[in-house]
Amino acid sequence: GVFAGRVGIPRLLDLFDRYGIKTTWFSCGHSIETFPEQMKDVVARGHEIGLHGYSHENPLAMTPEQEEKILLHTIDLVTELSGKKPVGYRAPWWEFSKVTNDLLVKHGIKYDSSLMHDEFHPYFVTTGDKWYPIRYDQDPDTWMKPMEFGKETDLVEVPCSWYLDDLPPQMFIKSSPNSFGWVSPDVIFELWKNQFDFLYEEGEGVFPITIHPDVSGRPQGILMHRKLIEYMRSKPGVTFVTYAEACEDFLSKK
């Protein structure tokens, strides 16, 4: 929304500058064109721009032709904005269609961050996965079958998680019955800190937090992020990187 562009983006940029952190902004084409000065500032301050559809349209609701046209258009928008072709993508609604993976590979996208087959460790996306939905109108023998995993592709997945997303618990949306908006940032801090502590104890991995300018750009969000960043920075060996850097680190070890 307008608050995100006018207020949330500048606040988050100042937050990241405060700690010298470079981040990845998966930005809708609509936002790039509606708030050009703010988005130019994101690039000027050294952050990565990733793809995120045009108007947050759901890939599952589109034809392959529509999905590809939007992908190509937003690639052009990000390239014009940042001066280089984007290498990362996050699907609106975190939804992959049957052709999303193939389209990303076809058009040179190196990594995605929309899937949740792991929490903290990148992996290669598979295409052609098949599972059998329950069909009460059919003989159970037709659907009592295990999931069949498809072929591994060259697309790297830097996973995301609903449990590391600021929006579901902290953004009120009138038309969405499961939105909240009044969950205390202290609760979110404890949830995220506990997950971080588990990963830190387990060993190496990525900690992929998803935040939004219209949520974390609120005063209570900024203060919580300061606290979380300072806590994570206090742990030896912790570094903050962009998603592109996480992807390259994963590939360098293969």
Question: Residue locations for each model-derived region?
Answer:
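Conserved, mostly hydrophobic/aromatic
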Residues: F16, I49-H52, Y89, L104, ...
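Active-site beta-loop-alpha junctions enriched in small/polar residues
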Residues: C28-H30, Y54-H56, A91-W94, M116, ...
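Active-site-adjacent pocket scaffolds in enzyme catalytic domains
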Residues: T79, K84-E202
